[in-house]
């Protein structure tokens, strides 16, 4: 296999380093903004040197972002090249277009590292769904958020924990995609499309991040025997899919509560096989690069071109997803009064309320400048 590598940052450099030990998978050209000693004569700053080279049969895209990644992936496929990517942003935004094009051109399109980093999640999901019905996918899918929450449990502030995460390379300089939820949302969206063999758009999934979490919120939940995580969940029942990303509280001793630091836990619930979970590093140079290399080996072994066949829109109805919440706010609002089950100091425990309704209410408070925090309490069947 002759490989063209689009991008030589953290992941791209890791892929190149791993592949030096495998003569069967040869990186023959590297696109980067600048050359290094490791690239030597393979360096180019022109994408066409890779995309138009007939000797290159597989392209690895690890640039990040939607553009020009989408255009270059598409051009590679039209040239009859297989594509492996770790770029969740472009896969989520252009899912149907890229999967359709890979079929049209009869080339492989793999993106295991885009949803799970170093965890072989999508390939495992691909395998189990052939023999069982996937009822739900779920998990703690962002290591940056999990590290921040783990640090805050020790008494530190959100800002201090974020700064530590950035210093360790767990969070980007602009942490918005991590702490506000889009990174988790994209992983859930990709996982849901594959699990339920159809298409759900990013904007069909309600999403909230952890930016409003305070140290005292974690202390309050700890008194209740709960730990906070940024939780992704999607389930299919009676032909309808419900999905959400939001802060959620889990009982101490549960598997999700036990995931600490920058680790991820991703899993699914099967009709016959029960719960299946995977734990590992969801990001990082070599964990992510290793998943890219696994995809390359699958392509070389002529494994399936993609993980699922369906591209038809799924019937999304998030109103069927109802949860109890713990809410901290100074607002006095008729809706809040209506859903209050009990008051506990600065916090309110709600009656079960639909996720879209709660998210809309929280967004309206924030739009008015009212500070608010909310943690869902998912039903046990969602995670155990």
Predicted features and spans:
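Glycine-rich adenosine-cofactor-binding loop
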Residues: 2-17
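NAD(P)-binding Rossmann-fold cofactor-contacting core
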Residues: 21-39
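Rossmann-fold NAD(P) dinucleotide-binding segment
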Residues: 45-86
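Rossmann-fold NAD(P)-binding glycine/threonine-rich loop
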Residues: 70-75, 88-126
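Oxidoreductase and adenylate-handling cofactor-binding alpha/beta cores
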Residues: 119-134, 148-158, 186-200, 295
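Catalytic, metal-anchored helix/loop core of enzyme active sites in primary metabolism
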Residues: 134-141, 146-152, 164, 170-175, ...
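Substrate-binding/catalytic subdomain of NAD(P)-dependent oxidoreductase enzymes
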Residues: 162-265
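A conserved regulatory-domain signal marking ACT and ACT-like small-molecule sensing domains
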Residues: 296-298, 302-384
């Amino acid at each position: 296999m002759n490989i063209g590598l689009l991008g030589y940052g953290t992941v791209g450099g890791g892929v190149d380093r791993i592949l030096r030990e495998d003569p069967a998978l040869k990186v023959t050209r590297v696109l980067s903004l600048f050359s290094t000693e490791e690239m030597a004569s393979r360096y180019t700053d022109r994408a066409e040197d890779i995309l138009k080279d007939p000797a290159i049969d597989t392209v690895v895209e690890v640039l990040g972002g939607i553009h020009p990644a989408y255009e270059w992936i598409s051009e590679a496929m039209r040239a009859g090249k297989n594509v492996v990517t770790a770029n969740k942003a472009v896969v989520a935004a252009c899912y149907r277009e890229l999967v359709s094009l890979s079929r049209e051109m009869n080339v492989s399109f793999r993106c295991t590292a885009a949803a799970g980093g170093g965890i072989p999640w999508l390939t495992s999901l691909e395998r189990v769904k052939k023999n069982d019905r996937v009822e739900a996918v779920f998990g703690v899918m962002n290591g940056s958020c999990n590290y921040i929450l783990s640090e805050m449990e020790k008494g530190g502030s959100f800002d201090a924990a974020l700064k530590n995460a950035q210093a360790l390379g767990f969070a980007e300089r602009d942490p918005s995609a991590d702490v506000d939820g889009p990174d988790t949302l994209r992983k859930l969206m990709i996982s849901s499309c594959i699990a339920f063999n159809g298409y759900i758009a990013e904007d069909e999934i309600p999403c909230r991040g952890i930016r409003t979490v305070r140290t005292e919120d974690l202390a309050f939940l700890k008194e209740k025997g709960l730990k906070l995580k940024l939780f992704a969940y999607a389930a299919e029942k009676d032909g309808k899919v419900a999905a959400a990303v939001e802060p959620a509280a889990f009982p101490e001793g549960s598997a999700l509560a036990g995931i600490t630091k920058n680790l991820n836990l991703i899993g699914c619930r099967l009709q016959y096989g029960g719960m299946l979970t995977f734990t590992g590093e969801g990001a990082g140079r070599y964990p992510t690069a290793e998943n890219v290399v696994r995809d390359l080996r699958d392509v070389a072994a002529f494994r399936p071109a993609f993980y699922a066949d369906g591209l038809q829109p799924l019937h999304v109805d998030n109103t069927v997803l109802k949860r109890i919440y713990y809410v901290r706010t100074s607002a006095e609002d008729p809706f809040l009064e209506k859903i209050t089950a009990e008051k506990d100091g600065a916090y309110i425990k709600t009656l079960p309320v639909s996720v879209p309704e709660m998210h809309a209410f929280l967004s309206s408070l924030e739009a008015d400048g009212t500070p608010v925090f909310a943690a869902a309490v998912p039903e046990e069947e969602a995670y155990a």
